[in-house]
From Swiss-Prot:
This is Ribose 1,5-bisphosphate phosphokinase PhnN. ATP binds at residues 15-22. InterPro entries: GK/Ca_channel_bsu, P-loop_NTPase, PhnN. GO terms for molecular function: ATP binding; ribose 1,5-bisphosphate phosphokinase activity. Catalyzes the phosphorylation of ribose 1,5-bisphosphate to 5-phospho-D-ribosyl alpha-1-diphosphate (PRPP). The keyword Transferase applies. Keywords: ATP-binding, Nucleotide-binding, Transferase. One of its GO terms (cellular component) is cytosol. The gene is phnN. Its EC number is 2.7.4.23. SUPFAM superfamilies: P-loop containing nucleoside triphosphate hydrolases. Pathway: Metabolic intermediate biosynthesis; 5-phospho-alpha-D-ribose 1-diphosphate biosynthesis; 5-phospho-alpha-D-ribose 1-diphosphate from D-ribose 5-phosphate (route II): step 3/3.
Length: 192
């Protein structure tokens, strides 16, 4: 949990499947490599590495449950039949003044808002037809499953005032530039 006087900031990246969260975060990670003000969190997931999926650490269900029980996660949640966790070490990064960036589920936004006084929620979105096309190109779901997934999507801005939305329907370069601009703004405010 974050101290009362935070030095860094937690940036929670959310958005629907197919919006391009990993693509934008990967590009930002490359652009910011070597800049110690920024730390991209590597998620821990109960799934083995597969081509075409995000780079993550894997734990089986039993080891994940044990790690959660031992308090080794800053946050953890369940989605799409898998369990996801963020390592507790991210709190040390924030305490040290870093802008910590993590891909999270909207289900944990209330926990993030409760635990981290210095935070930003970045919603990566795209038009529905763009999402459908991207999900279809992955080849992991049927047309019906994609339609059901898109029907479940809801808005992410709940009026709390900490949300920035980036529309990634077009060129990913423009979306990445907007994301980097936001991260640099946070870093300037954090250091000031």
């Amino acid at each position: 949990m974050q101290a009362d006087t935070p030095k860094g900031c937690f940036v929670a990246v959310v958005g629907p499947s197919g919006a391009g969260k990993d693509t934008i975060m990967d590009a930002a990670r490359v652009a910011l490599s070597g800049d110690m003000r920024f730390h991209f969190v590597r998620r821990i997931i109960t799934r083995t590495q597969m081509p075409g999926t995000e780079d993550h650490d894997s734990l089986d269900e039993a080891d994940f449950a044990r790690a959660a029980g031992e308090g080794r996660f800053a946050l953890h949640w369940q989605a799409h039949g898998l369990r996801y966790g963020l390592p507790k070490t991210l709190d040390d990064e924030i305490a040290g003044g870093a802008v910590v960036i993590a891909n999270v589920s909207r289900r944990v936004l209330s926990d993030i808002r409760r635990l981290y006084t210095s935070r930003s929620v970045v919603v990566i979105s795209a038009r529905t037809e763009v999402l459908a096309q991207r999900l279809a190109s992955r080849g992991r779901e049927s047309r019906e499953e994609i339609a059901a997934r898109l029907a479940r999507e809801v808005g992410f801005d709940d009026g709390s005032g900490d949300v920035v939305t980036i529309d990634n329907s077009g060129e990913v370069g423009a979306s990445t530039k907007a994301f980097l601009y936001h991260l640099h703004e946070i870093a300037v405010k954090t250091i000031a």
